């Protein structure tokens, strides 16, 4: 089986694949103070909790936006799971073409999202794809119907913006991010919740419409798929997001690994 690891700024998400099926998934905090030994023990505990052992894992791959954690997780996987954790980078095989000024500088989280979005949703329909990832940053990735990565947009993340709002103001306190009863807030908490939720739904819709004009001015409209921790909540209020795939990034890691190490992937 393949262990796919997504190292994000807030969380580390790991998933176990049997061929193309995600059979279990776990989350750990992205903690730069944590040692490889501590992460290794966590992985063992999570595996055992779901009825698996290190012997079940034959290969592993990671996409990371936190470089200091890369060697930590690599050693944890090597020492505790006895496999090499392959690091996915922008210069490896992915989409048919990458139209980015410096492909090596493209974050692999963005690249694997684009790859999965096209392979799973765009390619079967012969349509372009826009992937909206609601993470620590809000990222939109654009892929043509032919599988060309065209670039994208990076904006503040929902929680990032909400935390900045409370830090930079004297009277606004942190609120739970949830759907308010109405767009018009009748207290401070509801007003903030409305601004956060409907504001980001509007941000996503506005960007998707502008990107669509550039991607497909005359062709079929793109498939718009969202992922990330708050994607489901925002998608309900969005007029452009067509579907939510919470496992898109892990699927992209699997797909990119299979493209670059096909022999090892075939044995997973």
UniProtKB/Swiss-Prot annotation:
Pfam families assigned to the protein according to its UniProt record, in alphabetical order: Pan_kinase (PF03309)
Cofactors that this protein relies on: NH4(+); K(+)
Similarity annotation: Belongs to the type III pantothenate kinase family.
Catalytic activity: (R)-pantothenate + ATP = (R)-4'-phosphopantothenate + ADP + H(+)
Binding annotation for ATP: 6-13, 136
Pathway(s) it belongs to: Cofactor biosynthesis; coenzyme A biosynthesis; CoA from (R)-pantothenate: step 1/5
Protein name: Type III pantothenate kinase 1
């Amino acid at each position: 089986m393949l262990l796919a690891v997504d190292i994000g700024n807030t969380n580390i998400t790991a998933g176990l694949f049997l061929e193309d099926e995600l059979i279990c998934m776990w989350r750990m905090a992205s903690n730069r103070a944590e040692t490889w030994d501590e992460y290794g023990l966590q992985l063992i505990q999570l595996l055992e909790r779901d009825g698996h052992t290190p012997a079940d894992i034959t290969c592993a791959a990671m996409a990371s936006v936190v470089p200091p954690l890369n060697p930590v997780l690599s050693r944890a996987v090597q020492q505790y799971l006895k496999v090499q954790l392959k690091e996915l980078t922008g210069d490896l095989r992915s989409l048919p073409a990458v139209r980015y000024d410096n492909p090596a500088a493209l974050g692999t989280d963005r690249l694997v999202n684009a790859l999965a979005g096209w392979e799973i949703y765009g390619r079967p329909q012969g349509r372009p794809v826009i992937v909206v990832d609601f993470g620590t940053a809000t990222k939109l990735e654009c892929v043509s119907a032919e599988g060309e990565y065209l670039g994208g947009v990076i904006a503040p993340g929902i929680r990032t913006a909400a935390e900045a709002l409370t830090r930079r103001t004297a009277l606004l306190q942190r609120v739970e991010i949830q759907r308010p009863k109405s767009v018009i807030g009748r207290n401070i908490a509801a007003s903030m919740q409305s601004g956060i939720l409907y504001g980001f739904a509007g941000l996503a819709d506005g960007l998707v419409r502008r990107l669509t004009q550039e991607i497909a001015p005359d062709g079929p409209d793109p498939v718009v798929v969202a992922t990330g921790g708050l994607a489901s909540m925002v998608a309900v209020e969005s007029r452009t997001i067509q579907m939510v795939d919470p496992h898109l990034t892990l699927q992209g890691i699997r797909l990119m690994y299979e493209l670059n190490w096909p022999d090892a992937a075939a044995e997973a």
